[in-house]
Amino acid sequence: LPVAKPVLIEQLMAGIEDSQRVEISGIVRAFRPRGVVIIFEIASGGYRRDVNVPPPAGIDPQTLIGAKVRIRGTAATFFSGKLRHLITVTLHVPRAEDFVIEKMESGDPFAERVIPLDSLAQYRSEHEIGQRVHVKGIVTYQRPGEDLFLQDATGGMQLKSHLLKAVAPGDVVEAVGFPNFEQFLPVLQDAVFRKVPESPQRPTTKTVNLSELQGGFRHADLITIQGKVLDSVERWFTLPGGGKPGRRTILTLQSSDSLFSVEGPATGTDAGRISVPI
């Protein structure tokens, strides 16, 4: 095989290395088996890319989450048919030895100290970039296979997680994941969580007005807000990665001179004909 050309992830994502043998580095964020290969999701420079790799001999892929790796493979760039817009870039690794583990995650992240939820967006000199953090809180809401919301004494946090196991509001859980920002708001990505053997606790709600929400000050908090129901529809949804489909109720409400939407489990009632506080 030809010598792999070291490239930045930005070069790869620009599509200019299509069909070339290249070398990139990054952090393993997730994986999923597919046929005779394992698809690793690699994060680098704010991008995430799929890398198709023959199963590493004698290594449990789960232990590679958080590891820094160096990868050599062929870049495959996918474009839309007529407009030739770049859709995605995948790296195909022909040999297991082209998937080089440079540094494993330093220990069990669940053994690290628990950090307050409001500190995820703050500077922490002891935190190594690209490594997972350990949090703990009370469950306020969950969409299994999609996300989970936690609350502690400092505030709330959204955790993105593909786990389908269900937890209930009030359950106390601990989680580890990669801190990041989405739409300029802090979030814990690729989170793994587990229940803590503690008695369920009642989450604290905050009474707010619509202007606070419009200012972005209550992201991931459990809140109470009042509004007049103007419309109600039910929509089908399917869990990410499969699973049994279900229904959700979408309410359109009015508060003062503004409209906003509320999403929740299907109620089976004609909520569109009544005005209720929520």
Locate each region found by the language model.
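OB-fold single-stranded nucleic acid-binding module
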Residues: L1-I278
